[in-house]
């Protein structure tokens, strides 16, 4: 990660929060995806069986999030991003538990550190529409 972040190429990162807030597939959407009726839509719901059970057990809802498809959607269409920030980033390269962890510097304490674009929120409706198109 340190080599990539110091490469100078533009980098966009997206964490779990946008997926949990903006790419959550609830019961209604699960049914909509199923009704698309393609092998892709069936696969999309079927592969989430374990996550759906976990979400039922923990949160009491039949739902799942789609972090990887959301990341791909952001790559394909930057208009899906509703909020982002350019921040400095460092990778911990020391030995120990935090080795490889990224530290995001929102306070600009290390202005010479490499910068990344951090996606904070997405337009969930745009993501969902793109998802449905890709499953049709």
Named regions from a protein language model:
Residues 1-6:
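Active-site glycine-rich loop that binds ribose-phosphate moieties when present
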Residues 11-136:
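Conformational coupling and interaction surfaces
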């Amino acid at each position: 990660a340190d080599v990539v972040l110091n490469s100078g190429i533009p980098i966009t990162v997206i964490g779990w929060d946008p997926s949990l807030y903006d790419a959550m597939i609830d019961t209604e959407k699960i049914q909509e995806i199923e009704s698309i009726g393609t092998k892709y839509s069936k696969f999309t719901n079927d592969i989430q069986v374990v996550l759906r059970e976990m979400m039922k057990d923990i949160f009491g809802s039949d739902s799942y999030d789609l972090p990887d498809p959301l990341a791909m959607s952001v790559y394909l269409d930057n208009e899906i991003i509703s909020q982002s920030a350019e921040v400095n980033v460092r990778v911990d390269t020391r030995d120990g538990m935090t080795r490889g962890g990224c530290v995001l510097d929102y306070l600009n304490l290390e202005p010479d550190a490499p910068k990344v674009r951090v996606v904070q929120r997405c337009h969930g409706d745009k993501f969902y529409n793109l998802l449905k198109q890709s499953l049709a």
